[in-house]
Amino acid sequence: MLNCNSYMGDKNNKKLGLKESISLVVGNMIGAGIFMLPASLAKFGSISIFGWVISGFGAILIALIFKRLSQKFPGKSGPFHYTKEGFGEFLGFFVVWGYWISILLTNAGLAIAITSYSGVLFPILQNNVQSIMFSIFVIIVIAIINNYGIKTAGKFQLVTSILKILPLLLTIVIAFFVFNTDHFIMLNTSGESNFNALTATAALTFFAFMGIESATIPAEGTHNPSKTIPKATMIGSILTICIYLFSSIALMGIISPIELANSTAPFADATGIVLGNIG
């Protein structure tokens, strides 16, 4: 995730364009949530798909708010400035610190997710000590890259966004070959009412939409922010919602509910199932 320090002191020719701004939204939204949530949602059954739809609709509404605010206050950097403009510096102070703490916690979760998936390729990372050290290493490396400036950080964000999207798109593609509709027979397997299951899955999946405001944060380092940021916010949000929904459906069609609930790396397991079937 890009660090706000990397937005300081960059020249105009080093400002972010539309594709980098979109990658900010997509890359920061597609984090630990989508890679780890399918296992948590498996116990609810196929009703979790509707949870994604509900939270996705809520995310679109929030994206529209940020779009409007970025047009009303062009060049102003995200939630802090928006709050300050409307309610004063005192509340703006609390918002910026609350936002910083939330991002700090999110980065920790993302590092854990990266380590969990890396453990599939490197079993040594399944050891507690090695996994902790690797997670810390990931955070340090990203922090160092951020300090090289906004353009470098933007390019890095674009590359990492593509790398995060690829396994999700791969899951959607391979689902065409091994999709099992029997996995969707039971709508609600949680033992709770449909309403309670929907509210629970909507709350869980909404975590995956953190980062929807990302294009607004480096407004001062964005080229033509009044046009670039609104476009990036909406395009990035809609693209991410579609990827979330279709990759989740694909994953549920590949892995049985019981196996999915016990998985520590669902998308890696889905690839393993396909390769096993081919073999």
Describe each model-derived feature in a short phrase.
Residues 17, 31, 69, 88, ...:
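Hydrophobic/aromatic residues within transmembrane alpha-helices of membrane transport systems
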Residues 20, 47-50, 91, 152, ...:
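Residue-level recognition of membrane-helix boundary sites in multi-pass small-molecule transporters
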Residues 26, 30, 50, 54-61, ...:
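Lipid-exposed faces of alpha-helical membrane segments in multi-pass integral membrane proteins
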Residues 33-38, 145-151, 180-181, 278-279:
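Transmembrane helix-loop junctions in multi-pass membrane proteins
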Residues 39-43, 60-139, 143-147, 152:
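Hydrophobic transmembrane alpha-helices that form the core helical bundles
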